[in-house]
Amino acid sequence: MNALDISSVTFCYDGSPAPALRDFSMAVADGRTHALLGPNGAGKSTLMRIITGQLQGQTGGVSVYGLQMPDSKALSFIGCAPQPISLYPSLTARENLRFFGAMAGMSKDQIALRSEWALAKTGLSEYSEAAGTTFSGGMQRRLNLAAALLHSPKLLLLDEPSAGVDPQSRNHMYDLLMELNAGGVTILLCTHMMEEAQRLCSGLTLLDRGERIYDGRMSDIGNLEEFFLARTGRGLRDL
């Protein structure tokens, strides 16, 4: 079974002369790690918002484990760490997790248990009572990931998860993501870091100007930077 199926999605913002996504399709098999790459403006963030039901395509559809979005059960399978960090800076780390756990319909006991686990896994246990205003950008990213993991999702959507994270914490995050995947969590990673994509992902979808221009195995590519340049005509500065 596929964890994610996107079928012929077209989406155009009001007033835009060209669609952000044009007849876009892709699939991610259950238990896989898949990277989403493309130049700035390729449609990556739009696609992530469509997957989570924040936007609705003018054509096509999205299903998660066979359930058509935005089905509530399908949404419960998804954990999302978006690029714009969705935390409340006036709350402590633990209070943020308590809030997001309640939004996910978790019981108080579940929230308490999973919060301890998520804080430990993201290296934030000692900062659990610290206010978000004291967190660095990298710490906020890690708390963003902790919130996404709180309800034990089957499909994890990550949009630039390691941006601003220090190298040591980034490696710790990579180890955690590989551990989660080994435990059966499917991961879709949207990143501008090619080394990150190659280290973590077995599959790759490449977008440019709203269209899919490659969809296949990472192992078939070789040098990802050269492949990206050849397919898009653009380099790292355009990511």
Where are these regions (language model features)?
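Conserved ABC transporter NBD signature motif
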Residues: 60-74, 214-216
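Helix-to-loop junction immediately C-terminal to a conserved catalytic motif
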Residues: 52
